[in-house]
Amino acid sequence: MSVIGTKKTLNLHKYSIKVNDFLSNWKIIIPVIFTFAGIISGCIGGKGEGRLYKVVADYFTNVILARDTLSIASEFIFYLIFPAIFLIAVFFLGLSVFGSLLTNAVPLTYGYLIGCVSFFLYNNYTLKGLAYCLIMIFPYGVLCLLSIVLCCRESISMSEYIVKSISKTGKFLNYGFAIYYKSFLRNFIFIIIASAVKTILQYLFGGLFSF
C-alpha cells in the first residue's frame, strides 16, 4: 500500500510540475490564444459579412490580387512592410506600462485578417481559393505570426519590467532595453524569411491563380 501511495504521490507531483511549466509560459500561450481567436472571429465575420470583413475583402481583391507583379526586390519589400508594421506596434507597446494589457491586440488583429482573407477565398473560389491559401498565404502568415507571438512575449516582459522598475516592487534579473531590442532583431528574422518565401512562391505559383 505504501508503495502504491508513493507512486500516486510521485505522479501527482509530476503532473503539478507540468502544469506549472505550462502556466510559466503564459506570455507565449496568451498571444497564441488571441491569434486563434482572431482567426476564428475573422471567419465568423466573413460568414456574417460584417462591415470590417467587407473592407478587408475589398482591399485584398482590389489591391493584393489585382496588382501587377513587381521586381523581386519590390515584391520582397512589399511583403516585408505589412508584418513589420505589426512588429513596430508590438515593440512600442512594450515600452509602455500598459503594454502587457494591449500587446495581445496585435496578434488578435493579424489573426483576424488571416481569417477574413482565408474565408473570403474559400467562400468565393472554393478549392481554388483553398489552394491559394495553402500555397500563397499560410506559409507566409504562419512565419509572420510566429515572429509576432515571440515579440509579444518580449513586449509583455518589457512592460512588466518597466512597471516593476517604477513601482520598485521587484525587478527582472539580466533584463532591460538592450535585451529587449536584441530579441526583436532576432525575431525579425522570421519576417525576413517569410517575405523571401512569399516572394519566391509568388514568382513560382502566382501565375497559376487568376481571380
Positions of PLM-derived features:
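Alpha-helical transmembrane segments of multipass membrane proteins
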Residues: F34-S41, F86, L143-S147, F190, ...
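Cytosolic juxtamembrane amphipathic/interface segments immediately preceding
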Residues: T9-N25, G170-I179
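Terminal transmembrane helical module of multi-pass membrane proteins
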Residues: C151-F211
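Perimembrane loop-to-helix junctions flanking transmembrane segments
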Residues: Y53-S74
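Alpha-helical transmembrane segments of helical membrane proteins, especially in multi-pass transport
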Residues: M136-E160
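Conserved mixed alpha/beta catalytic, RNA-binding, or beta-rich assembly cores of soluble enzyme
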Residues: T103-T126
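N-terminal signal-anchor transmembrane alpha helix
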Residues: K18-Y53
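Hydrophobic alpha-helical transmembrane segments
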Residues: I77-Y110
